[in-house]
Design a protein with these regions (language model features):
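Aromatic-rich peripheral "rim/lid" segments of glycoside hydrolase catalytic domains that contact
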Residues: 122-187, 196
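Conserved structured core elements
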Residues: 97-104, 113, 147, 171, ...
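Beta-strand-rich binding/interaction modules
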Residues: 175-216, 225-232, 240-247
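Short, low-complexity, polar/charged sequence segments that are solvent-exposed and flexible
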Residues: 62-67, 138-142, 182, 199-202, ...
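Short C-terminal domain-edge/linker segments immediately following a structured domain
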Residues: 73-86, 150-158, 212-214
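Outer-membrane beta-barrel proteins
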Residues: 95, 167-169, 186, 219, ...
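Substrate-binding/catalytic cleft of secreted carbohydrate-active enzymes
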Residues: 1-138
């Protein structure tokens, strides 16, 4: 729908300045939809994400009433015909993990957008009413698929979320990892001044480096800067995955 002057808010995929709905992640996290959201009323990004995963054939046994999982039957038959039915759970788990990761990317990009009025997913649950849309972290019965815990999901979608703007994700050990830390806070109460602890860990949980930064008081309804982290990687001796943890 075209934005009109009478709109008190605007729910859309796109404004006159570009796309506000996000479907993708990027090689960095230092980006947002601020420019695209800068119009004369609050904008809400419509149907963000929509990451489709492989069906979970174990869900078929839940259909005990008048509705039959005919779409599941078609997909299962095709997989069996191609000799890959034994890989069905692997496909489901792998694509499900990718979906969870993509929702984290999408959600955080819009939380970094300080002038965004919000966002709405196509759904937390799969949508079976118009073909097959396996886009949810919950199945069509609103039950968990076992892909992510509620606590883990809330790390990137909650009233208060810590954010890190990273210019890139791949570094050499002669470089310095940098991240601008921010907080999205729409909780009920302001946050007092304090300290934010950060820790860079390897895949085995060993600490590469840790420290803390002093944080200012944070009012409600804001996206605020907390400070910057600079970590020399000269002690990293081989290629590996490192994760930044904050508390």
């Amino acid at each position: 729908r075209t934005h009109t002057p009478s709109d008190q808010y605007y729910v859309s995929h796109v404004t006159e300045k570009g796309w506000i709905t996000v479907y993708e992640g990027k090689p960095s996290t230092d980006w947002d939809r601020k420019k695209e959201s800068d119009i004369d009323c609050p904008v809400i990004a419509h149907e963000t994400g929509q990451r489709c995963m492989y069906p979970n054939f174990a869900e078929m046994e839940k259909y005990t009433g008048v509705v039959s999982p005919r779409n599941f039957e078609v997909f299962r038959e095709r997989l069996a015909r191609n000799g890959m039915l034994h890989q069905a759970d692997d496909f489901f788990r792998a694509t499900g993990a990718h979906t969870v990761l993509q929702y984290k990317e999408v959600n955080e990009s819009l939380l970094r957008t300080a002038n965004s009025g919000g966002f709405q997913l196509l759904g937390l649950a799969d949508f079976p009413g118009q073909g097959s849309a396996f886009v949810g972290i919950l199945d069509a019965f609103w039950e968990s698929k076992g892909l992510v815990s509620p606590e883990k999901y809330r790390e990137s979608c909650a009233p208060t979320v810590l954010l890190a703007r990273m210019p890139k994700r791949t570094y050499m050990n002669n470089e310095t990892f940098t991240a601008k830390l921010e907080i999205y806070h729409y909780g009920e109460h302001p946050l007092k001044r304090g300290k934010l602890n950060w820790e860079l860990k390897d895949g085995k949980g060993n600490t590469v480096k840790k420290g803390n930064i002093s944080t200012p008081a944070i009012p409600c309804a804001t996206v605020d800067s907390l400070g910057k982290v600079n970590i020399s990687l000269n002690k990293v001796s081989h290629a590996e995955k490192l994760t930044l943890h904050t508390t």
